[in-house]
C-alpha cells in the first residue's frame, strides 16, 4: 500500500462528441474516451478504473461495464468497477477514483462516465 497522497490531480481527459451514434455501442464510445484520456495523460497507466453508468443494463442489455471496458482497452490486470448512482453516476465514479488516489491505494485511477 502507498502512503496517503496530499494532492490529487486530473492528469488527462477524453470525451466523445455528444450526439446520436446508433452504429456504436456504449462500450465503443467509452473505450474511445478512455484511450483519449490515457493519451492526454501522457500514457500514465491507471491502477483502477471506475465506470459511472446507470442505464446500460436496461437500455443496452449490457451489465458489468467496468470489467468489460478494462479488457476492451487492453488494461487487463486492474480492477474495473461499475458505479451506479442514478443521475450522479459519473460524479460518483470520479469521487471513487479520487478517494482511491487520495488514500494511497493507487497512484493513478481512471474515472469514466457514460450513457447511451
Language model segments and positions:
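Conserved "HGTGT" condensation-loop signature of ketosynthase/thiolase-family condensing enzymes
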Residues: 1-80, 99-103, 110-116
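Active-site nucleophile and cofactor-binding loops and adjacent substrate-binding regions
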Residues: 80-90
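Conserved phosphate-binding catalytic cores of ATP/NTP-utilizing and phosphoryl-transfer enzymes
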Residues: 91-99
Amino acid at each position: 500500500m502507498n502512503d496517503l497522497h496530499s494532492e490529487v490531480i486530473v492528469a488527462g481527459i477524453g470525451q466523445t462528441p455528444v450526439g446520436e451514434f446508433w452504429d456504436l455501442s456504449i462500450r465503443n464510445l467509452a473505450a474511445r474516451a478512455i484511450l483519449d484520456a490515457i493519451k492526454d495523460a501522457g500514457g500514465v497507466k491507471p491502477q483502477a478504473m471506475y465506470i459511472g453508468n446507470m442505464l446500460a443494463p436496461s437500455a443496452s442489455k449490457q451489465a458489468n461495464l467496468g470489467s468489460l471496458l478494462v479488457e476492451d482497452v487492453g488494461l487487463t490486470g486492474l480492477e474495473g468497477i461499475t458505479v451506479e448512482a442514478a443521475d450522479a453516476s459519473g460524479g460518483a465514479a470520479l469521487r471513487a477514483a479520487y478517494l482511491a488516489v487520495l488514500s494511497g491505494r493507487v497512484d493513478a485511477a481512471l474515472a469514466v462516465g457514460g450513457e447511451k
